[in-house]
Amino acid sequence: MQNSVIEFLKPRLVDIEQITETRAKVTLEPLERGFGHTLGNALRRILLSSMPGYAITEVEIDGVLHEYSTKEGIQEDVLEILLNLKKLAIRIEGKDSVTLTLKKSGIGPVIANDILYDSNSVKIVTPNHIICHITDKNTSISMSIKVQRGRGYVPASSRFHSESDILPIGRLLLDACYSPVERISYNVEAARVEQRTDLDKLIIDMETDGTIEPEEAIRRAATILSEQLEAFIDLRDIHQPEHKEEKPEFDPILLRLVDDLELTVRSANCLKAESIHYIGDLVQRTEIELLKTPNLGKKSLTEIKDVLASRGLSLGTRLENWPPTNILDN
């Protein structure tokens, strides 16, 4: 029970009833009145439309040029084969896409387990799923199957619509339904905590394609909802401009006096005679210009170069907008 009348009850996961391998009922209670429908509807929409998953997006079948054709010795036409492939539950690990191959000959059904794949990165959840039937002993079928990771429903036309794109003959594109959740409904019942009887109990009935467990699906959906709501937690006045810290136009060391370099008296006097008072003035001079300075020889030039190098500076540096206003004012 909450400690204050203004505090909200926090629901807890009461029960997970596993009905089948792919279907489960998840119960949460207690919820404040009305929150059963609020959370139930939000989770339902996310689970149906926003969950990432895997789908077959492209297929190439040897001897087949387009989806409206048939293949001799195969009971199903190409359209039916593609529909059967769309129902295949498959999961890939560590990759966003993978291309699989299937080869089968001889009379009998062609099932998902006939697909050649790396068991370390690919898992076929429904290995006995029928893709087609071979009716002639001399017939064989070979196909290339591309599986991709995505979210929601993506029609083939949106993945291949540019006028500059040329679809290779024989490559068949499928509309991709990535969502691993096949069916979901929720029900809100009355719940009770001590003397309160106006609370909600949320029961979510969900069925997946087997690539994800119902409990994990709800956890991911709740995470997505939480991340989307984070923007509302720290609202700012959109009319109030953000104060950005102004970066100095010049490196502060360039604004320091040449005296800070601790040059020999001879070198320092030569620079002052040429009105070189700031380090920024000095680094813009070239070696040739400094050698033209009266009484400044190669030894003094070497000293100046070494001192500047120790501070990450060098002669002949070009500085835009030099000198700055504050130096001119001084």
From Swiss-Prot:
It holds the Pfam family RNA_pol_L. GO terms for biological process: DNA-templated transcription. Its EC number is 2.7.7.6. Gene3D superfamilies: 5' to 3' exonuclease, C-terminal subdomain (1.10.150.20), DNA-directed RNA polymerase, insert domain (2.170.120.12), RNA polymerase, RBP11-like subunit (3.30.1360.10). One of its GO terms (molecular function) is DNA binding. Belongs to the RNA polymerase alpha chain family. This is DNA-directed RNA polymerase subunit alpha. It comes from Blochmanniella pennsylvanica (strain BPEN).
